[in-house]
Amino acid sequence: MSILEKVQPIETMLPERYYTMSTENMEKRVREIKEKMGGKLFIPGHHYQKDEVVQFSDAAGDSLQLAQVAASNKEAKYIVFCGVHFMAETADMLTTDDQIVILPDMRAGCSMADMADIEQTERAWKELMKLFGDTMIPLTYVNSTAAIKAFCGRNGGATVTSSNAKQMVSWAFTQKERLVFLPDQHLGRNTAYDLGIPLDKMAVWDPHTDSLEYDGDIEEIQVILWKGHCSVHQNFTVKNIENVRKNHPDMNIIVHPECCYEVVAASDYAGSTKYIIDMIESAPSGSKWAIGTEMNLVNRIIQQHPDKEIVSLNPFMCPCLTMNRIDLPHLLWALETIERGEEINVISVDKQVTEEAVLALNRMLERV
């Protein structure tokens, strides 16, 4: 038998044996590996992850928080990121070259991030430059690919989060007359409106038709919104709010700004994931809340606050499907391959893309 025949190929899809393991055995193995590896292993877990995954997280938070925490951890060799692809990309860009970022399931993407690819964006920028010249600055939500962050970096722009969007949009208007906001039109619209920019000064760029959607004199345009959205938050409607108002008139309604403008306008409060968590945490016992955000997080908030009446704004809401791809079997698989000295599902961003994307990230980080 030759040496080549003895080498076993590294599996790239979840092996069948993980489907037959009991939850108890999987949890036991995860704990064993975590204890064995100690500080060499770091597991960040996004707020939208399942409880079966979050229970093993060394840190929980939103995408940028987790990337920053990972970057500040210089001891860990392996960062097993329990989130979606763009989050792991950001972690890879902010960590050192000798740290390895792993995504337990490479199918864990983000439909919103995928709504703006670099070819579409370069083409749009070229067309918009014909219309507006050098009067625009691009901002991208951190929920975007590394390539889009890099595009913003090399064009003088920056990244934003739902927590600091107002600060970053305000900064953008000190740089240029117009703003191009990618890839979530709703966060861009809600933020700009909150800063006093009228809706009739906002246009939408449709990447599928390569056209600007706007009725009126284009010289009046201040904000150009990319036609993208979050598939989860898009499902909250004004009708949901009307139903809550009718059946529970004393219930507070709080939503994420990835919801559409009409939903945000009709709600009592709107803010980032952290804002929602903090608001419920500080609310008095006995208060009532309908929350418009991802279902795994809503369920976790309900469990953490039994003294409050909390429901999802949309009773038929499902968890984020791509976030849900990261589960206990995939987490254990990733950890066991590391234990064997193998590396699967490694996230590695091109160096030039990293340099330009980090420009955009740093322009944000130095201002917030």
From Swiss-Prot:
Domain of life the protein comes from: Bacteria
Origin species: Bacillus cereus (strain Q1)
EC identifiers of the protein: 2.5.1.72
Top-level taxonomy: Bacteria, Bacillati, Bacillota, Bacilli, Bacillales
Biological role stated in the UniProt entry: Catalyzes the condensation of iminoaspartate with dihydroxyacetone phosphate to form quinolinate.
SUPFAM superfamilies, per database record: NadA-like
Annotated residues for binding of [4Fe-4S] cluster: 110, 230, 320
Main location: cytoplasm
Catalytic activity: iminosuccinate + dihydroxyacetone phosphate = quinolinate + phosphate + 2 H2O + H(+)
Parts forming coiled coils: none
Positions of iminosuccinate binding: 46, 63, 141-143, 162, 256-258, 273
One of the record's GO molecular function terms: metal ion binding
Keywords linked to the UniProt accession: 4Fe-4S, Cytoplasm, Iron, Iron-sulfur, Metal-binding, Pyridine nucleotide biosynthesis, Transferase
Keyword Transmembrane helix included in the entry's annotation: no
Cofactor(s) named in the record: [4Fe-4S] cluster
Pfam family, one: NadA
HAMAP family referenced in this protein's UniProt entry, alphabetically: NadA_type3
Subcellular location: Cytoplasm
Family listed: Belongs to the quinolinate synthase family. Type 3 subfamily.
Any GO BP: 'de novo' NAD biosynthetic process from L-aspartate
UniProt name for this protein: Quinolinate synthase
Bound cofactor: record note: Binds 1 [4Fe-4S] cluster per subunit.
Statement: the UniProt record of this protein carries the keyword 4Fe-4S: yes
Main EC class the enzyme belongs to: transferase
Pathway: Cofactor biosynthesis; NAD(+) biosynthesis; quinolinate from iminoaspartate: step 1/1
GO cellular component, one term: cytosol
